[in-house]
Amino acid sequence: MRGRDEETGEFRGASRSQQRREALEIFDLGEKLVALTPAQLAKLPVPESLIPHIEESKRITSHIAHKRQLAFLAKHMRREDEQTLAAIRDALDANSDTARREVAAIHRVERWRERLLAEGDVALAELLEAYPAADRQQLRQLVRNAIHERAKNKPPRAYRELFQVLRELSQEQGLERGDSGLEDDESAAEGDE
């Protein structure tokens, strides 16, 4: 109950400002849930009672109506206990960390591809030294074809195929974890610039 405690004179409960901050935090959490795909949403510990409200919020496209539906979703979310909301927040944070790692892995593969195209056999030798299971002939042919396609302004078929081969190699042998020493190469390249 709000108001002052008669004995101590201190306020009971959260202030209005604190209540507004908490309500806005839950509203933002609802917006994040609505932005997720159905597959991503299925991985989260969202109570079944909230699913229809989330789907309805996705369906509504009119700006004001969408905002009103999000407020309605937030109202239902405030009825949930704090542990449920904390579990949803934690799962969303873990989901974003996973996505960030995947993006970083793709960037590493792209950097390897660009190094192979720019440095040629030097970069290929480093890649093969780190990953002896890689097919030297296939990689060399893809690099040669990608350079040729670039010079002739042709569609980048070999360029894409080189990316796919490097990505498969990274998933098989741990290139995504940065075991290749690529970070050292990047810092050396940045120091040269």
From Swiss-Prot:
GO terms for cellular component: cytosol. One of its GO terms (biological process) is assembly of large subunit precursor of preribosome. GO terms for molecular function: ribosome binding; rRNA binding. The keyword Cytoplasm applies. Residues 1-10 have a biased composition (Basic and acidic residues). Pfam families: DarP. Residues 1-20, 171-193 are annotated as: Disordered. Residues 181-193 have a biased composition (Acidic residues). Keywords: Cytoplasm, Ribosome biogenesis, RNA-binding, rRNA-binding. It is found in: Cytoplasm. InterPro entries: DarP (IPR006839), DarP_sf (IPR023153). HAMAP family: DarP. Member of a network of 50S ribosomal subunit biogenesis factors which assembles along the 30S-50S interface, preventing incorrect 23S rRNA structures from forming. Promotes peptidyl transferase center (PTC) maturation. Belongs to the DarP family. This is Dual-action ribosomal maturation protein DarP. It comes from Xanthomonas euvesicatoria pv. vesicatoria (strain 85-10).
